[in-house]
């Protein structure tokens, strides 16, 4: 058996989902440990390699050390597993641009967020920086009225096409322009923002202040709720200090067999009229 210790797990992270059911909390906050068979220990090391949450890199220690052949085999299995990922759009004919292919919120997750918004009493959503429309479609399919703002004309055309493909074009108003400039003109109970992270976002420290237009929208929300999709590595400590109990941070795991233990993003909710 190998003792596996993982340090740096945030308090808001469901550790059993991330690490597995055999892990127990250690004496220090964020520390977890388990006694695992060699293959299971190698699998955990492979899955967590290079990951960071809340602005801090995870530290994984395995004693006694794993053999090189076992490590290589586990990493090969993990690479194959990553190919089975939660799909973006599931209907044939959806349109993307290059950014949309890797930044699109999976369809199942976007629809869950839409239904959650309905349960919160939200009626109207402003999707500020809608991209190719994944989140807008999730809200619209849940029955909400959506204003989708995007500054890239090609991307906005993709979003409009995808809304038509899913039969919700009549629930979405599409606006070409700057999200910050148009935010306060949008009739909405909820601001939603999925800022561009960059395809190779830094895994150990991303400040929300660097995720434009999110900081500006926080100032402009004027009592509205603000939800955001941010990278798992985002350090939200300054927001936690500022917003206190009105801030909820929820890690979002994949829904497919290959990514069900992988955090796809953080769903950040700043309470307002739609708390």
Regions found by a protein language model. Give the residues of each.
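S-adenosyl-L-methionine
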Residues: 2-123, 152-186
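Conserved class I S-adenosyl-L-methionine
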Residues: 121-131
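Short, glycine/acidic-enriched loop or turn micro-motifs at the edges of active sites
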Residues: 130, 153, 181, 197, ...
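Conserved SAM-binding loop of SAM-dependent methyltransferases across substrates and taxa
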Residues: 132-144
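S-adenosylmethionine
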Residues: 185-253, 260-264
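Core SAM-dependent methyltransferase catalytic element
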Residues: 255-275
């Amino acid at each position: 058996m190998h003792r596996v210790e993982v340090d740096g797990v945030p308090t808001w992270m469901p550790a059993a989902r991330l690490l597995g059911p055999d892990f127990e909390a250690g004496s220090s906050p964020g520390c977890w440990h388990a006694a695992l068979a060699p293959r299971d220990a190698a699998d955990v090391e492979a899955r967590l390699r290079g990951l960071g949450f809340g602005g801090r890199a995870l530290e994984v220690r395995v004693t006694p050390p794993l053999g090189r052949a076992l490590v290589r085999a586990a990493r090969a299995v993990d690479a194959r597993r990553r190919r089975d990922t939660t799909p973006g759009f599931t209907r044939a004919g959806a349109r993307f641009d290059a950014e949309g292919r890797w930044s699109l919120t999976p369809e199942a997750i976007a629809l869950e967020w839409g239904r959650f918004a309905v349960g919160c009493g939200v009626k109207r959503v402003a999707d500020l920086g809608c991209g190719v429309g994944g989140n807008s479609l999730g809200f619209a399919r849940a029955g909400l009225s959506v204003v989708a703002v995007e500054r890239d004309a090609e991307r906005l055309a993709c979003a409009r096409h995808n809304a038509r493909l899913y039969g919700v074009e009549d629930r979405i108003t599409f606006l070409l322009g700057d999200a910050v400039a148009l935010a306060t003109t949008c009739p909405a109970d909820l601001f939603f923002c999925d800022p561009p992270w960059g395809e190779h976002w830094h895994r150990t420290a991303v400040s929300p202040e660097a995720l434009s237009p999110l900081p500006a929208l926080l100032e402009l929300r004027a009592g509205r709720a603000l939800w955001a999709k941010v990278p798992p590595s985002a350090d939200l400590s300054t927001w936690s200090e500022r917003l206190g109990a009105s801030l909820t941070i929820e890690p979002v795991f994949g829904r497919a067999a290959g990514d069900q233990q992988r955090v796809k993003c953080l769903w950040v909710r700043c309470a307002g009229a739609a708390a």
